[in-house]
Amino acid sequence: MTNKNNQALDDYMRAGALMRLYKTVGAELYTTVGKVVSTADRKKLLRALHGIDTVCSNAEDNMFRDHPYLSDQYTNVFYGTTESEPRSEVDKAVLVMAREAAEEITTPRHIPG
């Protein structure tokens, strides 16, 4: 649950963007790794991915509790992948944030020696 101070809507949007990125990678991971591991390990991976769906649902509940004025366009913040077609302007913004996050995460950083 969120803390006593409402989380900023931007925090929820960023979290949703990262969840989409995670789901995109997770689907690819399941497809690729699933070819080289046992059925038992594939099931473990699938359970982990389904656990993320529960986390997304809880985060969405928190977002609407913290921001009850939001329109139904915000129901897509935590759902979909980076490959999804945008379903609303809010969805489009989250997709842009997800792609920006992917760029940030995969860009090498200079680490001082």
Language model features: what each stretch is:
Residues 35, 39-84:
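Short, charge-rich amphipathic interface segments used for partner binding and complex assembly
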Residues 4, 23, 35, 43-44, ...:
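Context-gated lysine
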